[in-house]
Amino acid sequence: MLETKEFKFTSTPEKGEVSALLVRPDTATHLLVLGHGASSNMRTPMLGAIAEGLAGHNIATFRYNFPYSEKGGGRNSQATVTETIRSAVQAARGVCPDLPVFAGGHSFSGRMTSTAQSESPI
């Protein structure tokens, strides 16, 4: 069975809440926190296909939006983006405390997740 739940979490104190989407198979062994590309959001069909494919391999996903993709406007500063990534990982750990957590993303969020990790462990 596949569990799908929507959540909100605080991205940064200044930017407020953003949306997240958990896709968790009953047999999940790991959780991937998965960010989107610069010009899309967590509901892009590609990320949906990735989440579905990973679920078939017992990997849960926690997709999330950045504040700019949630509320409109221009892209957020690097500091806001990396803080949002850290907040997403923390929120994912709270939702699935029983699973080892990994973080990554498509294009922009993949680079920014690497940047956040290089600044200080996520």
Identify the function of each model-found stretch.
Residues M1:
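Short, conserved catalytic or adaptor-binding loops enriched in Gly and charged residues
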Residues T4:
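Nucleotide-activated sugar donor-binding and catalytic core shared by glycosyltransferases
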Residues F7-P100, T115:
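Serine-hydrolase catalytic machinery in alpha/beta-hydrolase-like enzymes
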Residues G105-S109, T113:
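Gly/Ala-rich beta-loop-alpha elbow adjacent to hydrolase catalytic centers
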Residues T115-I122:
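Conserved hydrolase catalytic core segment
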